[in-house]
Amino acid sequence: MKAFLLTLLAQLCSASLVPEREKDPEYWRQQAQETLRDALRLQHLNQNVAKNLILFLGDGMGVSTVTAARILKGQLQHRKGEESLLEMDKFPYVALAKTYNTNAQVPDSAGTATAYLCGVKANEGTVGVSAGVTRDRCNTTKGQEVTSILRWAKDEGKAVGIVTTTRVTHATPSAAYAHSANRDWYSDGEMPLDALEGGCKDIARQLVDNIPDIEVILGGGRKYMFPKNTSDVEYPQEERHRGTRLDGKDLVQAWHDTKPAGKVAKYVWHRRELLALNVSRVDFLLGLFEPGDMVYELDRNNETDPSLSEMVAVAIRMLQKNPRGFFLLVEGGRIDHGHHEGKAKQALHEAVELDRAVGLAGRLTSPRDTLSVVTADHSHVFTFGGYTPRGNPIFGLAPMQSDVDRKPFTSILYGNGPGYKIVGGERENVSAVDFAHANYQAQAAVPLRQETHGGEDVAVFARGPMAHLLHGVDEQNYIPHAMAYAACIGPNRAHCSSAARPAATATLLPVLLLLLLLC
């Protein structure tokens, strides 16, 4: 009822919907001229070699989520919201990526991760392997492994890191280092007997074994690293948080053991430990802050769990020590989970936090030598509409009732999901519930226990060296190829001996013409 009254109050104040400055046509003309000047500056392309690469991945962050997050960001700053700018909005180059998997029109996060990290499209449910691998079929994996841009960067001597709000063994991060016929094989405790007997490794073990010199790994997923029934350090009484491994291995200790003599490897599980870290004295960092996924930003314990922004800040400072540069994968992974649960408020606050991390990374690096890319793996069947007035609370009601059942509805809705609610044979009256609550499940048209992904294209925002290569409508697997070209790594090293030629030629041309005239 409180939420209903607040929305009603906002709509009653609609007489002042238009800010005074926006009533003056000159305001819009000046704004357009500033945008035009910015666009004209793009004629001078940044063709530097990218020393550093940062890929920000908003899991499930479709265009409707980006727009709603922009409005939320503005409203959190006590503005109307629509006129706000996300940090990613400030990136000068924008493209669209087609997200389908090789066997799925509407994709999952594993096949898409293989595309934007490894540069090849793949089947849904598989990570780090080609489309020749069938989900769950361990015996189809051998010889079908594909490597990621993280591996390409490491092979060129760069530092590399992974930061996520999900498990570090989840679909997005795992495609950076693992090769698996099933994205859900987090530990050997989740694997079927035939896969174990077939010699396939679980994803947590691959994290330790495949690329042992990853400098930074931060996220959740402690329980997949410890033997079955090992009590969790933070939740010792909770059985669901205990270790899951059947092989008896302590993979945190194994992670320590793989590090070269003389190098300092640090494992942390508490925010205080992370923020107190002296990065100049640490060579390798593993931080696992929850047994499974990290807690939603709105519910986060500020004592024990770091925010995504805090993890990114530590990661960049760690990786910047390498004079050859770095590659960093940053995933705002729980945007996706919020949408699956129909909890739009959780999802959008996760998106705002990812954008906060984008801004922080921008302040810690320079676009002169750092290529930053922000994108999503897929969208969701999330929408907002209803002819809402300017400044309407993003989690509020539309200003109209249904002309069919005569009941109000929230601006935010889902095409399907757990928010399908029938009360007394009719659609639930949302004015009787707290629709502004963090865990409110927005109404959905079709009942499902979990809301589904959407199949439309996703945005790709780019800034820095060679960012102009990301333009138009591209296949999703193009992204790492463009980034690798910018950094002279992986399959795109060949051009690097002449990387400076376009700029050099442009600089020397006037001199050459002058010499010809003098002769």
From Swiss-Prot:
Carbohydrate-modified residues are 139, 229, 278, 302, 429
Active-site annotation: 109
What Gene Ontology terms for biological process does this UniProt record contain?
biomineral tissue development; bone mineralization; positive regulation of cold-induced thermogenesis
Where a lipid (GPI-anchor amidated serine) is covalently attached, the residues are 498
Q: Where, by residue number, does Zn(2+) 1 bind? A: 59, 109, 377-378
Catalytic activities: a phosphate monoester + H2O = an alcohol + phosphate; diphosphate + H2O = 2 phosphate + H(+); pyridoxal 5'-phosphate + H2O = pyridoxal + phosphate; phosphoethanolamine + H2O = ethanolamine + phosphate
Mode of membrane association: Lipid-anchor; GPI-anchor
Which Pfam families does this one have? Answer: Alk_phosphatase (PF00245)
Alphabetized UniProt keyword annotations: Biomineralization, Calcium, Cell membrane, Disulfide bond, Glycoprotein, GPI-anchor, Hydrolase, Lipoprotein, Magnesium, Membrane, Metal-binding, Phosphoprotein, Signal, Zinc
Instruction: Determine if Signal is one of this entry's keywords.
Output: yes
Q: Which family does it belong to?
A: Belongs to the alkaline phosphatase family.
Assembly behavior: Homodimer.
UniProt free text on domains: Calcium-binding is structural and does not influence the alkaline phosphatase activity. At very high concentrations, calcium can however substitute for zinc at zinc-binding sites, leading to strongly reduced enzyme activity.
Q: What is this protein called?
A: Alkaline phosphatase, tissue-nonspecific isozyme
Q: Which organism is it from?
A: Gallus gallus (Chicken)
Q: What is the organism lineage in this UniProt record?
A: Eukaryota, Metazoa, Chordata, Craniata, Vertebrata
Gene behind this chain? ALPL
